[in-house]
Amino acid sequence: MKVFVTGATGYIGTAVVAELMKNGHEVVGLCRSKEGAEKLTKAGAQALKGSLEDLESLERGAKNADGVIHLGFIHDFANFGSSLTTDVKAVQTMTNALKDTGKPFVSTAHAGGSASDEIVMESAKNGVRGSIIALGRSVHGDGDKGFVPQLIRIAHQKGFSAFVGDGANRWPAIHRLDAAKLFRLALESAPAGTYFRGTADEGIPFRDIAEMIGKKLNLPVQSITKDDAQAHFGFLGALASYDMPEPSKETREILHWQPEHPSLLKDLESGSYFN
């Protein structure tokens, strides 16, 4: 299958490109820069110059492909509304390009991106095999620059690793290589109009994460109140407090997906986070 991938040079995208090619697919990745194009060609993929705002390139990439995996997003949180608008237009353009073809369109769910999600779900009525994957809060592994590295940085700065209350609130996670396989399986076999939760760890007690960080940094671990969470964790205050279990039983059953890579706690213990 010839697959058009947005976000192909990103943290998850590079793993998805490798997973697709390893399983016999041909990949065309959207890229904005010469460096991105070189990264793709070095991996054995083709590069299509463009951006998420370049609707002509998105339409061409989708029309010339047998399927699309949409991972790209403009992470400009100072202009988040604009980023969401760009995503809606991009998703609309690509799903329109696949109309009445029966071809797959797999998108990652974005926080606050319900309008894009609705377009993907509606595309099932227009002859597109649209599906959405909502990944766990932490997509961990080598090269992670997300929430967990921020928790480690905060513990360094504060001199202790913290959890809120009794720390029983749960944090879902998935290894980036397991996520890559999940996107491939959805591309190959997801029914139209399906929404999947992509979690290997469906809910790790936040206290366990804090204790592992404290252990690896040789720092004390202590509880803080919910009122103090924002001051301690900054923008992560709410996420560090919420109970967010995300079961993936249906995902595993429908897509025959089984996580194979280290859990978040094992990755923290033996991975690259503290090198």
Describe each region flagged by the PLM.
Residues K2, L182-L236:
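Mid/C-terminal beta-alpha module of Rossmann-like enzyme folds, strongest
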Residues G127, I152-V164, L219-S223, D227:
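A short C-terminal helix-loop "cap" of Rossmann-like NAD(P)-dependent dehydrogenase/epimerase domains
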Residues T14, G29-Q92:
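NAD(P)H-binding glycine-rich loop region in Rossmannoid oxidoreductase-like domains
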